Amino acid sequence: MVVCGGPTVLRDLLGADTEPTWKDEEVCVVGLFGKTALAQGSWHKCSLINSLCDRHIFPLFHRAPERPSERSLFQTYYEQESRVLYVLLAGLSDTGSLLKACEELSRGVSHAEAHEWWKDEEKLYCMHLLYLFSVCHILVLVHPTCCFDITYEKLFRALDSLRQKMLPSLKPSLKDCAVGLDWKLNARPCPPRLLFIFQLNGALKVEPKSQGPQTNEKPKKHSPKRRLQHALEDQIYRIFRKSRVLTNQSINCLFTVPANQAFVYIVADEDEDPVNMLLEGLRHNCTLKDTESLVPISGPRRYQMMRHTRQLSFTVENNTSLSGQLVDCTLREFLFQHVELVLTKKGFDDSVGRNPQPSHFELPTYQKWVSVALKLYEIIIENKDDDPPAFPGGFPPKLLANMKVLEGYLDADTKFSENRCQKALPMAHSAYQSNLPHNYTTTVHKNQLAQALRVYSQHARGPAFHKYAMVLNEDCYKFWSSGHQLCEERSLTDQHCVHKFHLLPKSGEKIEPERNPPILFHNSRARSTGSCNCGKKQAPREDPFDIKSANYDFYQILEEKCCGKLDHITFPIFQPSTPDPAPAKNEASPAAHDGEVEGEKMKDKEPQTQGESTSLSLALSLGQSTDSLGTFPEGPKAGGDNTEASGHGTDEKVEKRPSLVDRQASTVEYLPGMVHLNSPKGLLPKFSSWALVKLGPAKSYNFHTGLDHLGFIPGTSYLMPWDIVIRTKPEDESDLDTNSWPAPNKSIPGKRNSVVMGRGRRRDDIARAFVGFEYEDSRGRRFMCSGPDKIMKAIGNGPKESAIKALNTDMPLYMLSPSQGRGLKPHYAQLMRLFVVVPDAPVQIILAPQVQPGPPPCPVFVPEKQEITLPSDGLWVLRFPFSYASERGPCYSPKENQQLPSYKVMKGILRTVTQ
């Protein structure tokens, strides 16, 4: 038997530069595909070719050549004597490829991703099968069991649909090939004939003929194996006819099966003892060795000895027959009865019915077949005429479209999962939309989406779970964003805008509620009552959404009606030098917060008395409010050399330090928020959030009647007295000499002191000032506090408490209002004004407010001018900001579970310096 080399990869065969000597021989192409058993070294498709060619072509433990770009691989072998070209397809159904795929999928891949990857590989395997069905005359399906795998029915229907879709693109590629017109029109030499080879795997015992008791039963005409073959043929034919894979006209079918020839063959292994098999092989080897010169051996000696040793049923079957029983044919005889029809150019006449149509058939030469096979390989397998993929590692567009055809046939799991998930989507949508307001926020959307996903996960199953979970997410977001999205802006009192998603009107633009999206101002529908800068007039106010409307615009409107004619001390603001000034970027160093907290701890450790100087805080603010290139001192040392002035009448002066406003302010960039101790140097806001107004002279305040302002709770509108000691020199101290006699009508000081107690000591004058911390709630209720969390209750002639305690402690910025509402939510009042009556006396009262509206690292806010000397003989009122905000955002009022002491006005807000 003349053979051609060993197995070759099909792509190498088609692209070979040298032409073989048999290029003009007419060849029959036989394709083999199918599944193999999982056991290593078990029955394999390669062993069939070894048996058919009677030659050891493929090794026992054959491994296909590894090509990273190809999971499925074609291998070929040409038997020149019989003029048969075998094309073997190895894919994921083989043990080696399956093991490698499982190793790749075990590297942390999710179930859905693994399923998708596996189905993509199955579709690519179908493309290789389509190629095999397009270039072969005969196809052999190999299966490791004796039961027909029903999944092949879906596979063949998918291949048929895929072939019909790709046929228009295959025809043009063959127009230049030297083959017949029918081949060019149908893109195949003939409708291939499909044969089936099964393995028993112990399902049917094949007893040796010498064994078994002798019986008088009449032997059956067919052996059990042949009867099983006939049963499988009937079953396969019925299945394919019912599913219309096979029809009357073979020219329209993907493949054909013969009507009057066997197309199923069963390979049966004898049940052998391994020890007996080895002993029998040894005997045969010895016998062959003794008679080596007498018996001619064709082919490799080793393979011939293996064949004689094992006597596999698909190699050489015993031709002896029982009486009356037909002899089973060998595997080669089974296959070559169909090959002979090809080589003799008779073709396959497998059409049935009343009017059968003849099918085309062509037997090409080896060279013509290679030219056609190369063209089809480039189109079907390599996709050379396709566009590049949309992304690296993806599939080309045409290949994706072809693979889409296969989804409905092959991916039953995904189809079931998609149907199941699609049924779960309406239930999830209902769960999302249940109990929803017309407009709602992101938080409500996320909560409802989580509830919808819980309902969805109870009903959805399979690999499409994540896909439709994303669809549910998109549907819910689309429902929310199409007219149900509430404006996400929160007011400075931490309340959401009630409008649906809208745009803010630009400068000079009108409000358009009917526009989509509408153009509206923010509105939370919350209203409160506030007082003007001086506190005399009250008016309702809208819930503010920005600092300017909260701390400036509202008071400017009331300023025109009430406080406009009063004296003011204005705070410095940003003065632009360009038409389009820009807000300054946040350049505050994170370390500034640490320095601020450390400085506050230093302040708390040092006891402060009445009127103690706040120069230490000022020094800290100067040292810590630096730009991004600045450095921070290790400790607060700026106030060490400063001589503090006592509130009891010391003559010492306070050394002035330059404040932020004394430096050159920027005229290009403005501060977007409010001034605090960590603000960059030289930056000022465009407006001031503070106000300092003079209500009148000091005598305009009546200690017995208090303030005559609206909204005060009875008995709480009084200011606390603050006695300031002014130290003076004794009378005639310069003229008095203790060593001389006293002047006429004068007594000796020492004796006078000993005689009249207190009449000869230094005379101390006391100036009386008045201080009041006013709190105001959202309903306009106002009251004074005489200390932390202590509401003033004055009866009769005014309060008896002194202001010294309140000035030397941190006053709360928020406290519970004495008039609580009916709800369970606590109602807070906020420190809004500081009233100071400055007497007409030789004393200076310096105002230095510092407010920390939250726990650290909340900044400490100060006015644009940190220290203000209040002129004498006046009733002054400092209006605090309604809301506080830095360049990082607003500082909201405390919640129910937050500690109120963290929101405070620092002690040392007032101090005195005698003149």
UniProtKB/Swiss-Prot annotation:
Cysteine-cysteine disulfides: none
Keywords from the named record: Nonsense-mediated mRNA decay
Listed Polar residues bias regions: 608-629
Region described as Disordered: 207-228, 520-541, 574-661, 733-755
Signal peptide from the UniProt entry: none
Composition-biased stretches (Basic residues): 219-228
Its biological purpose: Involved in nonsense-mediated decay (NMD) of mRNAs containing premature stop codons. Is recruited by release factors to stalled ribosomes together with smg1 and smg9 (forming the SMG1C protein kinase complex) and, in the SMG1C complex, is required to mediate the recruitment of smg1 to the ribosome:SURF complex and to suppress smg1 kinase activity until the ribosome:SURF complex locates the exon junction complex (EJC). Acts as a regulator of kinase activity.
Descriptive protein name: Nonsense-mediated mRNA decay factor SMG8
Organism: Xenopus tropicalis (Western clawed frog)
Lineage, uppermost ranks: Eukaryota, Metazoa, Chordata, Craniata, Vertebrata
